[in-house]
Regions:
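Extended ligand-binding groove/face enriched in aromatic
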Residues: 4, 10-12, 19-134
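Loop-centered beta-sheet repeat module
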Residues: 100-176
């Protein structure tokens, strides 16, 4: 399902963007092509292959947390879309959604410190995406875990050093992501 980009999370993010745009602008010129692309990718067979890949040897940390967070964001977008085809896609995506959420739930209790980089591994940005999904799905356990970890990691933070951002490799602001979360 998620191929054709430099990395897996970019493909997932691209699918989220297609869903968001097609849901937000159903009569736009691009909507039919976006829906066709989603229909090609979000099949039960394709998603089963993705789940199998994730469960492969040596992939326990695959796309954690950034890619898994975007996967959950895609699932939330499909759930928010009042459309029969989107409901089919959400159902097809469900096994990968469950696998992604379970991986986050298993990982976070072991993570003693936040990851404050301006890159994919950053926790605050991923937490924001995961929180949105948890709120949309009513996953109280995930909300509680994120709330606990967020308070543990960030509650005492003051005066984030914005003058040092961005660094030479950042594409996310650790300070702004933390404030957003």
């Amino acid at each position: 399902a998620f191929y054709g980009c430099y990395d897996w999370h970019s493909s997932v993010h691209g699918h989220w963007l297609l869903a968001r745009l097609a849901r937000s602008f159903p009569d736009a010129e691009f909507a039919a092509a976006a829906r066709a692309a989603l229909a090609r990718s979000l099949t039960s067979a394709n998603i089963a292959t993705e789940v199998e890949y994730l469960r492969g040897a040596g992939r326990a940390s695959f796309e954690r947390p950034y890619g898994l967070a975007w996967l959950l964001q895609l699932a939330a977008e499909l759930r928010a879309w009042d459309d029969p085809q989107a409901r089919e896609w959400a159902k097809a995506l469900s096994p990968l959604e469950i696998e992604s959420a379970q991986r986050i739930m298993a990982w976070l209790p072991k993570l003693n410190y936040p990851i404050r980089s301006g890159e994919h591994s950053q926790t605050a940005f991923a937490f924001g995406l995961i929180w949105d999904w948890a709120a949309a799905t009513g996953d109280v356990g995930m909300i509680r875990l994120l709330d606990h970890r967020g308070r543990t990691y960030y509650a005492k933070d003051r005066g984030c050093a914005l003058a040092y951002e961005p660094s030479g490799e950042d594409f996310l602001s650790p300070c702004l992501a933390e404030a957003d979360f």
